[in-house]
A protein has these predicted regions:
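Short, well-ordered alpha-helical microsegments
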Residues: 22-26, 74
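Short, well-structured alpha-helical segments in soluble
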Residues: 1-14, 25, 130-145
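Short beta-strand elements in bilobed, periplasmic/extracellular small-molecule ligand-binding domains
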Residues: 1, 60, 106-128
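Venus flytrap/periplasmic-binding-protein-like
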Residues: 35-48, 161-177
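Short beta-strand scaffold positions
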Residues: 16-17, 38, 148
Length: 177
């Protein structure tokens, strides 16, 4: 509803959507009149926000697409750490898998020969307690590295982040985000 109200205004020259959910909300009610700039999206192609790296598919929409962003990051993390089992937590939904860069992680794991240990028990809240439980489960499965995706429980402003990082530190599990 807010996205629709924004795009109906006549006094705006540009609307900026911050994050995948906001951009999807704007595009769902796009009237083609006001330019829309999408920012802060993990993977616009995988999220279905754009058609390709070359063409958004929407005349009044633009965003940056960094091809192979996550694949490159997973490769560098592996090259530096040489782990065997990388843990990933996510919400069991299409969006959750996109935010976790699961497709890229699976491809790189197969290419480089490491295993993914997955925890898909997060709700959309991604609370500290849910993430603590997820980390415990991943640790039991032998995780020796952890990918911190864009999860609420690891948000820099969230008070629950420090105990989660302390837990990973105690286990001597290297991380990257």
């Amino acid at each position: 509803e807010l996205a629709k109200q924004l795009l109906q205004r006549k006094d705006l020259d540009l609307v900026v959507g911050m994050g995948t959910a906001a951009v999807k909300a704007l595009l769902a009610v796009n009237d083609g009149r006001t330019p829309i700039l999408g920012m802060g999206m993990a993977d616009p192609i995988a999220a279905g926000v754009v058609k390709s790296a070359e063409d958004s598919g929407v005349d009044n929409f633009t965003c940056r697409v960094e091809v192979d962003r996550w694949s490159s990051m997973f490769r560098v993390f592996y090259d530096v750490v040489r782990f065997h089992k990388m843990g990933i937590m996510f919400q069991n939904s299409q969006e959750g898998r996109v935010y976790a860069a699961l497709g890229d992680a699976q491809a790189i794991a197969s290419e480089l020969g490491f295993t993914l240990v997955l925890y898909d028990g997060l709700s959309s809240a991604e609370s500290t307690e849910e993430c603590r439980k997820g980390l415990d489960e991943l640790h039991k499965k032998g995780m020796d590295a952890f990918f911190i995706g864009p999860l609420n429980c690891f948000d820099i402003g969230d008070a629950g982040m420090a105990p989660l990082l302390q837990k990973l530190n105690q286990w001597k599990v290297p991380t990257f985000a």
